[in-house]
Amino acid sequence: EKDEFINKYQCEQSQLLYTRYGINFSAYDYNALSVKPIGFDKEDFILSVGTDQHRDLELLDVIAKNNPDKQFVICSGNPEHHKRNFSRDNVTIIRASYNEMVYLYHACKFVVIPLKFNFHASGITTLLEAAAARKAVLLNYTPGLEDYGQHDNTCLFASLGDIESFDRNLNKLWDSEKLRNRLAENAYKYLHSDFNTYKYSQIYIELSKNILGI
C-alpha cells in the first residue's frame, strides 16, 4: 500500500502515516459469553469466517472436496446465497450472532481464511478474533499480512491460489495438536498487547491530530 500511494498517487513518504488495526481481545477470550447455534451438532470442525469478494470460496470448495473426512463450517452474512457454491456433505454454511461466533471459535479445531489478492489485508479481523480465542490459523498470504502474522510462528501462510500448499498446511494443523497449540499461544502473545482497540484508538487519535495539525 505504501508503494501504491508513493508511485501511483505521488505522495511523499512524510505524508504517509500508519497504524495497525485492533480488536477487543476480551470479547473472544475464555470468559466471553458463548451461545451454541440452534441445531448445530458439528464436532472437530474447521471454521471459516466471511464470504466477501476477497474470500477465495472456490479454493475452499476444492479443499473441502479433497478432505471429505473433515467437517467445514462457514459463517456468512448471506448463507442462502452462498449455499449454491457448496454442495458437499462436509460443508455447513450458517449465519451466526456475536455470541454464537464466540462459541464457534472456541469449539472449532482451527480457523482457515482463504483469500484472493487484495491490498487492504482482508481477513485481519478474523485472524485477530481467532488469536483472542487462542485458535490456530491457516490463511493465504496477501500484502500487509506480515504485520499481523509470522509463518510457522503465529500462523501458517499459503501462497495465493496454491491448493497444494493450503491442503498440506491444513492437514499439518489437523494432525498436530502440538502445532495448533503452539501457533495459537504465540499468536495471542504477539497480537493482544499491540493489536487491541485501546492501542488502535490511541494511535488513531495521534494520527488524526498530526493530520489536522492540532
Language model feature labels by segment:
Residues 165, 172, 179-194, 200-206, ...:
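A short, well-ordered alpha-helix in the C-terminal region of glycosyltransferases
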Residues 106-120, 135-136:
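Acidic donor-binding loop of glycosyltransferase active sites
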Residues 1-7, 11-36, 42-43, 54:
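Donor nucleotide-sugar binding/catalytic pocket of nucleotide-sugar-dependent glycosyltransferases
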